[in-house]
């Protein structure tokens, strides 16, 4: 997961679901609402996993089942441009982490392996049929790779969408100066902790200047029904759990995930043309080398399978599923075609 400057993070919280947010808080009357977001106004299948509920938002029918796991700040609606199209071909379920979207919080703040455990428990309790094609964006890419490492017989293929390499400390090793330029996890989580503190005092109000950096602005065509419920998801647990997830990534405890060979599993790794925008000349200088390292890491991930493919998506930023959704749809289609080939 690329590390943002505190200023950039504060300006774009939360990254991901917040990146649905690009325009005005109140659409003009002439704007036609994007009805695809209405599918996410209510929970899908709320699955009990030991006294708390995990939301699985499923569409379509068929096998294998495609499982969508969002990045660190997102939940099901981040896939609104992708999921309905995939559902025309097979069953596809978007997963909300504990405390994200309509899922209940966990009894403690989670680390990445906890999320993989929750996903496994939810798919089992929800009777979601195997095999699975796992699609993970950003931090979700590590979570789906952890899943494949722990339950390999359930996973038929994977699509990794600008995934975080599990050992982001390797970036500093390969590109000295990266941590100094971007501040590392500690400084980049400060805005999240500030938002957690505000949310702990009461519901956040998107019209409040004090809260505006914590709740992103939705796109102008977001339906009013979605706009109405959106602020309720930004709880103190949500912000604090994001810090916990990011900090667990920085601990290097998941480095081995990027080293497990996947045999002949169909695998597509997607990289953006531009990962982040940079606000200072120092960041820009580091970014040129940093992005080369990031792309090289993605290329190495693709080589973990004899049927791995790596693609750079022109015209896309970090959120390829929003910027270039067809690229994600095509990648899933490619994995499905590979699985349907005679053996």
PLM region spans:
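Conserved HGGG/HGGXW glycine-rich cap/lid loop of the alpha/beta-hydrolase fold
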Residues: 52-102
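Catalytic active-site module of serine/aspartate enzymes centered on a nucleophile-bearing elbow/loop
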Residues: 306-343
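Alpha/beta-hydrolase
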Residues: 174-300
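Active-site loop/oxyanion-hole signature of alpha/beta-hydrolase fold enzymes
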Residues: 97-135, 151, 177
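Alpha/beta-hydrolase-fold catalytic nucleophile elbow
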Residues: 96, 161-162, 270
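Conserved hydrolase catalytic core segment
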Residues: 130-173
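Alpha/beta-hydrolase fold catalytic core
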Residues: 17-66, 88-90, 109, 117, ...
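Bacterial N-terminal signal peptides
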Residues: 6-18
